[in-house]
Amino acid sequence: MKLEAENDLMAVRLEKLHQLQEAGIEPYGGPFEVTHSTTAIRERFDELEGQEVALAGRLLAIRSHGKASFADLQDREGRLQLYIRLDNVGPGIYELFQKLDIGDIVGVRGKVFRTHRGEISVEVRQLTLLCKSLRPLPEKWHGLKDVDLRYRQRYLDLIVNPEVKQVFITRARIIRAIRSFLDNRGFLEVETPTMHPIAGGAAARPFITHHNALDIDLYLRIALELHLKRLLVGGLEKVYEMGRIFRNEGISTKHNPEFTMLELYQAYADYYVMMDLLEEMVAYVAREALGTTVVTYQGDRLDLTPPWPRLTMLEAIKKYYGVDFDQLPTAEDARRAAISLGLEIEPGMERGKIINEVFEATVEPHLIQPTFILDYPVAISPLAKRKKENPDFTYRFEAFIAGRELANAFSELNDPIDQRRRFEAQMAERAAGDEEAHMMDEDFLQALEYGMPPAGGMGIGIDRLVMVLTDSPSIRDVILFPTMRPKEE
């Protein structure tokens, strides 16, 4: 019934389109010179009252009253009321206006005034049809409520839900602020390949494509890391890249197969430098994008002001779970502790992996305020440098906000012999069925053998940062066109 009603409305609009064309009116016009936005007219009303302005946008409401009518026009910044009188525009333009529908795009010229009810408006003197809309907007001006439809047809979401548009405006401010922060600190923005002969830099399942001319399979990148480290070898001491990453994995409120990652690397630094850099950058970005370092996310008040608390992984487990893994030196000891928590631990799992399983189950949900978790097990950190005092752990941290990982950073492993051993261990896990284990990357190892300076490196999930700063519960709310299951016919 809904589809039939929509088809009926489209038929009416098509008939209006034909009438306009027969009358010699172009329904899909050309350029229109805009002098002011709706926001500028509101903010500068005292200056503009009585002055002629030109603005363009989409009609979201039409109220006809005989020889005078009102309409609401929405442009990129907001809405403004239009007032159209037959006496002002003449019968030709007024007849055109009466053939318009909600959703049509128009350009108008007229004088700024305030109605008797106090509404800032434009008294239209000229009107140009710029685009005839053939489909009716959903639920008129009451908003698009179907969440699935919002994601599939984001253009409609942006039209009828102004708060959604604001999320993506804020996202652009966040990305601009990140670039400004890094550029001002001497980092060089670079671009590295999206298609890789070997998938590496993260534990993830890649997408595979085929290059016809070379007749080889290639992988869409799952990380930026290994190419950026090659640039450290080449002498570019402070580099960053912000780009799309592709991981052939599940979809959830926290995960989209295609997402935006920032990775940066600084020669002669370590993970302590990366901690300082991250907390300074997040606070800077929040101030630039929002004007504050205190935000609310899903009811929680988050203070992004540095310094952030720092705990080792073992300290965090002891704090939130009450178990001291320093007193559980063997994998079997760790396994029993994990099983007592109700976790399913595979036979033969390494102690470091068990510790991480316990951490994810017992600690992560508690990390609401910005927190650094330091010193991850070497078993899950194949690209991070080992701690000298405890080689079972690495100089690696993850930063958490609102119970979710925001960033991952290392003191980078630059020992090519140790790196080869790590890759060999990963290959053994891959042979045992772990599809997310690292592949052997001989070209990267060769680069390390020329010598890479000690460095700190970091990866930051841009979408998750935007989620926090815009109070968005799902990653789909901050990606313009998220990945969706094909629509059933």
From Swiss-Prot:
EC number: 6.1.1.6
Pfam families: tRNA-synt_2, tRNA_anti-codon
Keywords, comma-separated and alphabetical: Aminoacyl-tRNA synthetase, ATP-binding, Cytoplasm, Ligase, Magnesium, Metal-binding, Nucleotide-binding, Protein biosynthesis
Cofactor binding summary note: Binds 3 Mg(2+) ions per subunit.
Localization in the cell: Cytoplasm
InterPro entries: Aa-tRNA-synt_II, aa-tRNA-synth_II, aa-tRNA-synth_II/BPL/LPL, Lys-tRNA-ligase_II, Lys-tRNA-ligase_II_bac/euk, Lys-tRNA-ligase_II_N, Lys-tRNA-synth_II_C, NA-bd_OB-fold
Primary localization: cytoplasm
Residues annotated as transmembrane: none
GO biological process: lysyl-tRNA aminoacylation
Cofactor(s) demanded: Mg(2+)
rRNA-binding in keyword set: no
GO cellular component: cytosol
GO molecular function annotation: ATP binding; catalytic activity, acting on a protein; lysine-tRNA ligase activity; magnesium ion binding; transferase activity; tRNA binding
Residues annotated for Mg(2+) 1 binding in this entry: 398, 405
Subunit structure: Homodimer.
Name of the protein: Lysine--tRNA ligase
